[in-house]
Amino acid sequence: MPKLIIDLNATKENAINELNDFIDNRLHSYESLRNYDLGEDNHQNVSLLSPYIRHRLITEQEVISAALNKFPLPKIEKFIQEVLWRTYWKGWLELRPRVWDDYKDNILINNDKKQLLEKVLSYETDINCFNIWTKELIETNYLHNHARMWYASIWIHTLKLPWEAGANLFLKHLLDGDPASNTLSWRWVAGIQTKNKSYCLLYTSDAADDVRC
Protein backbone atom coordinates (compact mmCIF):
# COMPACT_ATOMS: atom_id res chain seq x y z
CA MET A 1 0.00 0.00 0.00
CA PRO A 2 1.35 3.47 -0.83
CA LYS A 3 2.61 5.41 2.15
CA LEU A 4 1.00 8.65 3.22
CA ILE A 5 2.86 11.92 3.66
CA ILE A 6 2.15 11.66 7.39
CA ASP A 7 4.42 8.61 7.50
CA LEU A 8 7.38 10.96 7.06
CA ASN A 9 6.54 12.84 10.26
CA ALA A 10 5.63 15.51 7.77
CA THR A 11 4.89 18.82 9.37
CA LYS A 12 5.82 22.30 8.23
CA GLU A 13 8.53 22.38 10.88
CA ASN A 14 9.90 19.03 9.78
CA ALA A 15 9.92 20.13 6.14
CA ILE A 16 11.85 23.30 7.00
CA ASN A 17 14.35 21.27 9.01
CA GLU A 18 14.90 18.92 6.07
CA LEU A 19 15.33 21.88 3.74
CA ASN A 20 17.90 23.52 6.02
CA ASP A 21 19.80 20.25 6.46
CA PHE A 22 20.04 19.82 2.70
CA ILE A 23 21.19 23.39 2.13
CA ASP A 24 23.78 23.27 4.90
CA ASN A 25 25.22 19.83 4.20
CA ARG A 26 24.49 18.60 0.67
CA LEU A 27 23.47 21.36 -1.70
CA HIS A 28 27.10 22.26 -2.44
CA SER A 29 27.66 18.83 -4.03
CA TYR A 30 24.23 18.42 -5.62
CA GLU A 31 25.24 19.13 -9.21
CA SER A 32 28.17 16.70 -9.23
CA LEU A 33 26.39 13.83 -7.43
CA ARG A 34 22.74 14.13 -8.45
CA ASN A 35 22.92 11.71 -11.38
CA TYR A 36 24.01 8.70 -9.31
CA ASP A 37 21.44 6.23 -8.05
CA LEU A 38 23.17 4.49 -5.14
CA GLY A 39 20.27 2.21 -4.31
CA GLU A 40 17.43 1.99 -1.85
CA ASP A 41 17.79 4.10 1.32
CA ASN A 42 20.92 5.72 -0.07
CA HIS A 43 19.67 8.85 -1.80
CA GLN A 44 21.41 11.55 0.21
CA ASN A 45 23.01 12.92 -2.96
CA VAL A 46 19.66 14.52 -3.88
CA SER A 47 17.47 16.82 -1.82
CA LEU A 48 14.65 14.39 -0.88
CA LEU A 49 12.43 17.45 -0.56
CA SER A 50 9.99 16.48 -3.31
CA PRO A 51 7.34 14.88 -1.04
CA TYR A 52 7.17 18.03 1.06
CA ILE A 53 6.91 20.23 -2.02
CA ARG A 54 4.34 17.96 -3.64
CA HIS A 55 2.07 18.19 -0.59
CA ARG A 56 2.74 21.94 -0.19
CA LEU A 57 4.35 21.78 3.24
CA ILE A 58 6.99 23.92 1.59
CA THR A 59 6.78 25.67 -1.75
CA GLU A 60 9.17 25.99 -4.65
CA GLN A 61 9.58 29.67 -3.80
CA GLU A 62 10.55 28.88 -0.22
CA VAL A 63 13.10 26.32 -1.37
CA ILE A 64 14.67 28.66 -3.92
CA SER A 65 14.77 31.62 -1.53
CA ALA A 66 16.40 29.60 1.23
CA ALA A 67 19.00 28.17 -1.16
CA LEU A 68 19.88 31.58 -2.59
CA ASN A 69 20.27 32.99 0.90
CA LYS A 70 23.14 30.53 1.40
CA PHE A 71 24.76 30.32 -2.04
CA PRO A 72 25.14 32.58 -5.10
CA LEU A 73 23.14 31.48 -8.12
CA PRO A 74 26.12 30.29 -10.23
CA LYS A 75 27.05 27.80 -7.49
CA ILE A 76 23.61 26.16 -7.35
CA GLU A 77 22.09 26.92 -10.73
CA LYS A 78 21.41 23.27 -11.58
CA PHE A 79 19.39 22.78 -8.39
CA ILE A 80 17.39 25.96 -9.03
CA GLN A 81 16.67 24.79 -12.57
CA GLU A 82 15.37 21.45 -11.32
CA VAL A 83 13.02 23.14 -8.87
CA LEU A 84 11.72 25.49 -11.56
CA TRP A 85 10.97 22.60 -13.91
CA ARG A 86 8.20 21.61 -11.49
CA THR A 87 6.39 24.91 -11.90
CA TYR A 88 7.00 24.94 -15.65
CA TRP A 89 5.37 21.53 -16.12
CA LYS A 90 2.40 22.52 -13.99
CA GLY A 91 1.78 25.57 -16.12
CA TRP A 92 2.30 23.61 -19.34
CA LEU A 93 -0.27 20.98 -18.39
CA GLU A 94 -2.80 23.49 -17.08
CA LEU A 95 -2.80 25.11 -20.52
CA ARG A 96 -3.34 21.73 -22.20
CA PRO A 97 -6.01 19.86 -20.21
CA ARG A 98 -6.61 17.52 -23.14
CA VAL A 99 -3.21 15.93 -22.50
CA TRP A 100 -4.32 14.98 -18.99
CA ASP A 101 -7.67 13.70 -20.24
CA ASP A 102 -5.99 11.54 -22.89
CA TYR A 103 -3.67 10.06 -20.27
CA LYS A 104 -6.56 9.16 -17.95
CA ASP A 105 -8.46 7.56 -20.84
CA ASN A 106 -5.61 5.15 -21.62
CA ILE A 107 -4.29 3.85 -18.31
CA LEU A 108 -5.81 0.38 -18.57
CA ILE A 109 -3.68 -2.50 -19.83
CA ASN A 110 -5.00 -4.57 -22.74
CA ASN A 111 -5.57 -8.26 -22.11
CA ASP A 112 -2.56 -9.28 -24.18
CA LYS A 113 -0.28 -7.33 -21.82
CA LYS A 114 -1.81 -8.33 -18.49
CA GLN A 115 0.42 -11.36 -17.97
CA LEU A 116 3.51 -9.23 -18.50
CA LEU A 117 2.17 -6.62 -16.08
CA GLU A 118 1.72 -9.34 -13.47
CA LYS A 119 5.38 -10.27 -13.89
CA VAL A 120 6.36 -6.63 -13.46
CA LEU A 121 4.37 -6.24 -10.25
CA SER A 122 5.71 -9.48 -8.80
CA TYR A 123 9.34 -8.54 -9.67
CA GLU A 124 9.66 -11.46 -12.07
CA THR A 125 10.77 -9.93 -15.37
CA ASP A 126 14.07 -11.01 -16.93
CA ILE A 127 15.60 -7.60 -16.14
CA ASN A 128 17.08 -7.62 -12.65
CA CYS A 129 17.56 -3.89 -12.23
CA PHE A 130 13.98 -3.29 -13.38
CA ASN A 131 12.70 -5.75 -10.77
CA ILE A 132 14.73 -4.00 -8.08
CA TRP A 133 13.31 -0.62 -9.05
CA THR A 134 9.75 -1.96 -9.08
CA LYS A 135 10.24 -3.36 -5.59
CA GLU A 136 11.72 -0.10 -4.33
CA LEU A 137 8.88 1.87 -5.90
CA ILE A 138 6.14 -0.26 -4.37
CA GLU A 139 7.72 -0.84 -0.96
CA THR A 140 9.33 2.56 -0.29
CA ASN A 141 7.24 4.84 -2.51
CA TYR A 142 10.35 6.51 -3.88
CA LEU A 143 12.78 6.19 -6.80
CA HIS A 144 15.81 8.28 -7.70
CA ASN A 145 14.95 10.61 -10.57
CA HIS A 146 17.34 8.96 -13.01
CA ALA A 147 16.04 5.53 -12.05
CA ARG A 148 12.59 6.82 -12.95
CA MET A 149 13.79 7.65 -16.46
CA TRP A 150 15.59 4.34 -16.88
CA TYR A 151 12.54 2.51 -15.58
CA ALA A 152 10.21 4.33 -17.94
CA SER A 153 12.52 3.63 -20.88
CA ILE A 154 12.57 -0.12 -20.20
CA TRP A 155 8.80 -0.12 -19.62
CA ILE A 156 8.10 1.60 -22.93
CA HIS A 157 10.89 0.63 -25.31
CA THR A 158 11.90 -2.83 -24.07
CA LEU A 159 8.75 -4.31 -22.54
CA LYS A 160 6.48 -2.44 -24.97
CA LEU A 161 3.98 -1.55 -22.27
CA PRO A 162 1.85 1.59 -22.69
CA TRP A 163 3.38 4.67 -21.15
CA GLU A 164 0.06 5.71 -19.62
CA ALA A 165 -0.05 2.55 -17.48
CA GLY A 166 3.50 3.17 -16.30
CA ALA A 167 2.75 6.77 -15.42
CA ASN A 168 -0.29 5.58 -13.50
CA LEU A 169 1.84 3.08 -11.56
CA PHE A 170 4.21 5.87 -10.56
CA LEU A 171 1.43 8.25 -9.62
CA LYS A 172 -0.19 5.55 -7.50
CA HIS A 173 2.94 4.70 -5.52
CA LEU A 174 5.29 7.69 -5.46
CA LEU A 175 5.00 9.74 -2.31
CA ASP A 176 6.07 12.76 -4.36
CA GLY A 177 3.95 11.82 -7.37
CA ASP A 178 3.07 15.06 -9.15
CA PRO A 179 0.49 14.80 -11.95
CA ALA A 180 2.22 17.27 -14.25
CA SER A 181 5.86 16.27 -13.76
CA ASN A 182 5.03 12.58 -13.81
CA THR A 183 2.79 12.62 -16.88
CA LEU A 184 5.02 14.84 -18.97
CA SER A 185 8.20 12.98 -18.01
CA TRP A 186 6.66 9.71 -19.20
CA ARG A 187 5.53 11.43 -22.42
CA TRP A 188 9.10 12.67 -22.92
CA VAL A 189 10.58 9.18 -22.52
CA ALA A 190 7.97 7.85 -24.94
CA GLY A 191 8.94 10.47 -27.53
CA ILE A 192 5.64 12.34 -27.66
CA GLN A 193 6.41 15.32 -25.42
CA THR A 194 9.31 16.67 -27.47
CA LYS A 195 9.07 16.17 -31.23
CA ASN A 196 11.52 13.63 -32.67
CA LYS A 197 13.15 13.06 -29.27
CA SER A 198 12.73 10.15 -26.87
CA TYR A 199 14.74 8.64 -24.04
CA CYS A 200 15.82 5.09 -24.79
CA LEU A 201 18.07 3.28 -22.34
CA LEU A 202 20.51 1.01 -24.18
CA TYR A 203 19.73 -2.00 -22.02
CA THR A 204 21.55 -5.27 -22.67
CA SER A 205 21.26 -8.62 -20.92
CA ASP A 206 24.91 -8.29 -19.85
CA ALA A 207 23.79 -5.46 -17.58
CA ALA A 208 20.95 -7.40 -15.98
CA ASP A 209 22.70 -7.85 -12.64
CA ASP A 210 23.70 -4.21 -12.36
CA VAL A 211 21.18 -2.33 -10.27
CA ARG A 212 21.86 0.78 -12.34
CA CYS A 213 21.85 -1.09 -15.69
Mark where each language-model region is:
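Single conserved hydrophobic/aromatic residue that forms the stacking wall/gate
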Residues: 206-213
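Residues lining hydrophobic/aromatic ligand-binding pockets adjacent to catalytic sites
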Residues: 1-205
